[in-house]
Amino acid sequence: MINIRKTHPLMKIINNAFIDLPAPSNISSWWNFGSLLGICLILQILTGLFLAMHYTSDTMTAFSSVTHICRDVNYGWIIRYMHANGASMFFICLFLHVGRGLYYGSYTFLETWNIGVILLFATMATAFMGYVLPWGQMSFWGATVITNLLSAIPYIGTNLVEWIWGGFSVDKATLTRFFAFHFILPFIITALAMVHLLFLHETGSNNPTGISSDADKIPFHPYYTIKDILGALLLILALMLLVLFAPDLLGDPDNYTPANPLNTPPHIKPEWYFLFAYAILRSIPNKLGGVLALVLSILILVLMPLLHTSKQRSMMFRPISQCMFWVLVADLLTLTWIGGQPVEHPYIIIGQLASIMYFLLILVLMPMASTIENNLLKW
């Protein structure tokens, strides 16, 4: 009798995606982050579901409901901190996953890459709205500052902001709708992730060399299932170390103060994973210009296939491009640091230089490096 996993309509899909899938024999640990992102997403949905059972999305009770979860609900504290720090792990995996895609030229799978960019935007939107829910000082002022950026849009800006707010300021209506969106978006992300995977399996995985691996494929199970389990264990270990030993390490102390519209915190800043984009936003003195730079800093990923001038797909055998890539990584780390600093000298000029460098590297220097390498190889 033929195995049920190959005949059953539902099992067949799972089999072709996770068991009998032909995978390149040489994919490194950088290919683990896709499965880790899936684990993060499941973990966030589960912890979020249990948090939603006790949370109230009302300005009068939101802050105290989070306190109630931590103090009175059985294991509420661990669920809350797993959710908050799970978001950080999610973004660490996301950035490494995107970085892998840039380094090894995975962006040449156009559909997979573009859905990935949409996934990145959706995840950022979800995380932003989730940060507003505890209704602390940084929640309130973060929501006010970021939603206010939309007022820079000509003609419709002010109306758009008031429409999103559901009033003339960030208030009860805003909190309620943010909770509704924060709840629904992860399920949309799950659907998009399935489409992401569907398009990936149309072409098959890339590999570190960037060369076709059709001649040398191995089954996904057991080789990559065991490898993914190791990655998952390390991810959970890192998350639990963070949750149990330093749960507030990546948070802002200001968020332990209930939201007060009459008192502005000295330094308004988002969570660490948005700081690079926040630094780019702040480095431009013009409001609309800043907003455009902020959006373009992520949207520029869509242009990567067009900016690929090399005759080789991967950076594995391209030392000049490798150098440029790591300068870009260093630049992003610099921007992340600057985003968390106050707006004063010398941080302003460092932020402006790092922002210019970011766009210069992606739009000019990296394509130039690829062209130089082509010429050196007489291609």
Swiss-Prot record:
Gene Ontology annotations for the cellular component aspect, listed alphabetically: mitochondrial inner membrane; respiratory chain complex III
Details of cofactor binding: Binds 2 heme b groups non-covalently.
Membrane topology: Multi-pass membrane protein
Signal peptide: none
GO biological process, one term: mitochondrial electron transport, ubiquinol to cytochrome c
Highest taxon, organism lineage: Eukaryota
Binding residue positions for heme b b562: H83, H182
Parts of the chain that traverse the membrane: 33-53, 77-98, 113-133, 178-198, 226-246, 288-308, 320-340, 347-367
Gene3D superfamilies attached to this UniProt entry: Cytochrome Bc1 Complex, Chain C
Cofactors (names): heme b
Residues that, per the record, bind a ubiquinone: H201
Binding-site residues, heme b b566: H97, H196
Subcellular localization: Mitochondrion inner membrane
Miscellaneous comment: Heme 1 (or BL or b562) is low-potential and absorbs at about 562 nm, and heme 2 (or BH or b566) is high-potential and absorbs at about 566 nm.
Subunit relationships: The cytochrome bc1 complex contains 11 subunits: 3 respiratory subunits (MT-CYB, CYC1 and UQCRFS1), 2 core proteins (UQCRC1 and UQCRC2) and 6 low-molecular weight proteins (UQCRH/QCR6, UQCRB/QCR7, UQCRQ/QCR8, UQCR10/QCR9, UQCR11/QCR10 and a cleavage product of UQCRFS1). This cytochrome bc1 complex then forms a dimer.
Record-given protein name: Cytochrome b
Organism from which the protein derives: Beatragus hunteri
